[in-house]
Amino acid sequence: MSAPILQIRCLNVAYRSRRGRLRALRDVHLDIPANRIVGIVGESGCGKSTLISTILGLLAPNAEVASGGSIQFDGLDLLKATVADWTRIRGPRIATVFQDPMTSLNPVMSIATQMIDIQYRTSEPAAEKRRRAVEMLDRVGIPDAAVRIDEYAHRFSGGMRQRIAIAMALLMRPSLLIADEPTTALDVTLEAQIVHLLKSLKRELDGSILFVSHNLGLIAELCDEVVVMYAGEVVEHATVRDLFHRPRHPYTRLLLACDPARVAEGGGPLQTIPGGLPDLAALPQGCVFRSRCPDGIDACQAQQPMRPAAADHEVRCVRAVHHG
């Protein structure tokens, strides 16, 4: 794996609640290599959104980040970033595409106005900023971009709005693009188009992408590496080929077995994972997947660290390491 553009070490995040502290992220270590696409998968509640919010410095007021952790980006620990640091980083250096493009698009401003405003840190004249915006819209596949740039968001379909959101995110050529389930609201055809678009833009713009999705098929198609999260922990991290062909963690194997696309290919009933996520306010001792795991042994009662299982493949499971 290549050198990281973003490096997370010993990240622990909890939320204060009436039931106590909800330990949403625990001992997260993660590298996002330069010029790679890293996918994050896991059930709802596994910590994906909290991880993204922490990277972006957008945690809720009731969140607590434990001391001792760090998120290194561009020579700066983002956990210690000031308001001035975030003004320099958010958008120009780390950009985000959200699930709902209307989260990024202002309905009462034309696309041109919004895309020109994004470039406020550059000293170029407005005409040059508009030219760059039109060029980026054209690159993401907006037809008649020079004309349609003056329209408003409601004039575009859902797929076109997501393309515009991607164009806006990439306009300042960020080093890291965070795509938070950007295809969930789109149909299958548009999903495929957005995935193809992200792959081509990643090659052209020479940046990294952190891609969050529930769709394992999209992860397999788009990503170079995959991170599997469960109940606030990273339980497996591998190249996409190795993870899909030889998953090591029991949770990863069960998650892949639940993929409807795999069931359609191989036949047979759709599997489910019994039980549910543990209570983050009262986590069990040892492996947090133990109560749902079909392969549990006595050693699972102790907390397990991430261990190398193969080249570029780590897993948080003592049985997976010893037995493959």
Predicted features, each with a name:
Residues 66-77:
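Conserved ABC transporter NBD signature motif
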Residues 76-77, 127-147, 256-257:
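Conserved ABC ATPase "signature" region
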Residues 78-95, 121, 242-247, 278-284:
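ABC ATPase NBD coupling module
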Residues 171-175:
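A short, proline-enriched helix->beta-strand linker immediately N-terminal to the Walker B motif
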Residues 178, 182, 186-268:
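P-loop NTP-binding/switch modules centered on Walker-like glycine-rich loops
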Residues 239-324:
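Charged, flexible cofactor/metal-binding loops and thiol motifs
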